[in-house]
Amino acid sequence: DPALPAVVVTGSIAEMIGGGVTPQGTNIQRFLPRTIDEDQWEAADRAMTWIFSEFGMTKGRMPPEAKRPEGAKPRVNILGPMYGVFNMASDLHEIRRLVEGIGAEVNMVMPLGAHLAEMRHLVNADANIVMYREFAGLAEVLGKPYLQAPIGVESTTAFLRRLGEILGLDPEPFIERAPHSTLKPVWDLWRSVTQDFFGTANFGIVATETYARGIRNYLEGDLGLPCAFAVARKRGSKTDNEAVRGLIRQHRPLVLMGSINEKIYLAELKAGHGPQPSFIAASFPGAAIRRATGTPVMGYAGATWLLQEVCNALFDALFHILPLGTQMDSAAATPTTLRRDFPWDADAQAALDRIVEEHPVLTRISAARALRDAAEKAALDAGAERVVRETVEALRGPGFGERKGENQ
């Protein structure tokens, strides 16, 4: 429809081939992501600001703000939801629920769900909510108060109180209802059979800064679960994936959250002793489809769902401790020559202790037993009369010497 504005998003190669030609007599404008010198978050930030400046502003001037009718609810924009960001559908659904729960209404969701002809209506909101800290530039341009979408119980409560203060609303009735409704399962999960492991079940997370900071703050700050490491993927910088692989090998967190990269690094550890850590998708890239609205991470509903996933991950870890029947049948018989009084050198025992310390507390007993039997069998097979340090280090695999030095 030539009467409606339209945008064609092109890439560098298409621009070189097409020469930037725009059909005459159309309202098509071109937006070129700088695919060579910026990442997807920088491109998203620039695209959102460009769309508003091109289709919302008039010659660089802000459009006039429509006065809110007497008695109408305060209005809020939600900025950031778009294809290609992790868990967007569920988190958007939860943020909308929070906004409407305290008595406000959503003015616009930008860019997903917004039309180019509606860009000038962005200024009609009384406040803005930025869902992802990686691209918040449009909130600065709009000039209204804005808040970061929350993750965790305490953060959500603080968010609602601040939003209520900005909009002139009382969020306390909604906050008081949450423990008896949305947050009620948190109590059940916290008192479940996995409660014995919360104090020792460490976790690691590698995700965009929005999720890495928020999830760590919730699990470690609100709930007290020990965090082995948290690596944030930030706009404008490249993640050191080799360092991430090293952190996973060094700490062996019982629960690992991340992208397909971290899932691959986790698979590399399967040859080791002890149970396998559980993986929870928390970032792109990865083959994780999250189009349903039942898997939030943000808000009160996100606090409930996230704790549920951690509990399920702990059950998975317990499952891996148990040997499968087929594995027991196919395993080699225990050598009768193994003796509990088989002599060990002191440095060999120290090396074994260092390996066991890499395992979560929950799984150390089974890991220590398996490693000790494997070391003694290797020594007997080699015709040795005692277990030496080199035998233990050989069980750990390549690179153990470097990690051993780090732990000393």
Curated annotation (Swiss-Prot):
Alphabetical GO biological process terms: bacteriochlorophyll biosynthetic process; photosynthesis
| One Pfam family recorded for the sequence | Oxidored_nitro
Q: In which pathway does it act?
A: Porphyrin-containing compound metabolism; bacteriochlorophyll biosynthesis
Keyword terms, alphabetized: Bacteriochlorophyll biosynthesis, Chlorophyll biosynthesis, Oxidoreductase, Photosynthesis
What the protein does comes down to: Converts chlorophylls (Chl) into bacteriochlorophylls (BChl) by reducing ring B of the tetrapyrrole.
What family name appears in the similarity comment?
Belongs to the ChlB/BchB/BchZ family.
Q: Which NCBIfam families match?
A: BchZ (TIGR02014)
Q: What is this protein called?
A: Chlorophyllide reductase subunit Z
